Amino acid sequence: MLFDRPVLLKHTDDFINAAKSKHVNEVYLISHALLETGAAKSELANGVEIDGKKYYNFYGVGALDSDPIKTGAEYAKKHGWDTPQKAIYGGADFIHKHFLSHDDQNTLYSMRWNPKNPGEHQYATDIKWAESNANIIADFYKNMKTEGKYFKLYVYKDDDKHQK
């Protein structure tokens, strides 16, 4: 699955171990990293040099739309993510603490849209972020010939398609 992404492939064990330590799905972590780093091609995946040292940020934590490389690298520096391993573990810790460990923001959809408090505490600004991430995850599961087990479906008042 990552054979054509050597930047991530050489850190497969780090993703697996970070996932285990933070009780996060490893397929999700890798998919999230692929999405946020443009399939591991961005500067944040390959290290951004600040003051003679490289910093990494695989999940786009702290990366603002105004200058995602600069702000993402500054966040990585502030948190000591000066190796890919530290960035993988640190990012997984951030995602777990600030999103997945909260019942109201533990899905891709709720991370992006925050239905309980729309417009506040959202992981991403891209309106297709949750869908794009879900598609990458679905492709991984399809290639592994398995299916996800747990789904949370949000149903809105005027959503005839999903009404019971």
Segments from the language model and where they lie:
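Structural motif
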Residues: H23-V24, W81
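Solvent-exposed, polar/charged alpha-helical surfaces in well-ordered, non-transmembrane soluble domains
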Residues: D13-N17, I30, Y89, D93
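Cell-wall polysaccharide-cleaving catalytic domain and substrate-binding groove, primarily
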Residues: F15, L35-D67, F151, K161
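Non-catalytic cell-wall polysaccharide-engagement segments
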Residues: Y59-K164
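N-terminal export signals and maturation junctions of secreted/periplasmic proteins
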Residues: M1-D14
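Short, functionally critical alpha-helical segments immediately adjacent to catalytic or ligand/cofactor-binding
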Residues: V24-A40
